[in-house]
């Protein structure tokens, strides 16, 4: 715990007070541990704490949020707008993070964003930024895109026209829909062939 505090102190000292710091515990803590750790990190003004406990633990997130005052970010591990509605209604989340590849594509992503808007909550789509950027631009409550190293279609090399992030910003393609053009040859290199092994027959 002390090591986390020293890391936060060092980073905050390095970047200064105006740069938002987002923390992700990757569901590693119990609610009690999350409260202790978040309380110790709060002096460094974290912008959000993402999934401090098991993602499905709605009431635990409510408890951690109320006990610490640190904004809770979650959503990458939720799959339906009904789950999102449950968490929003309970007051378990401050920043909503739907993943377009998990919630069912553009239509569901936009429904979740509209639902979040009704709770006055911002949306920061998780992962696959090339697919999410058009949707984000259509969200009145869109915050920004969350990107991960190696997690973009451009980095995977499957786009005929890569979309670049410049100084932390990207522009959506001018074409409708997701607007991206895949490179068929590059996609072929990622093709999975063969069949999955059959489960053993019950004895």
Question: Model-predicted segments: where are they?
Answer:
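Shared catalytic-loop signature of beta/alpha-barrel
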Residues: 39, 45-48, 56-169, 173
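C-terminal extensions of enzymes
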Residues: 159-203
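Metal-dependent enolase-superfamily TIM-barrel catalytic cores that perform enediolate-based chemistry
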Residues: 1-68
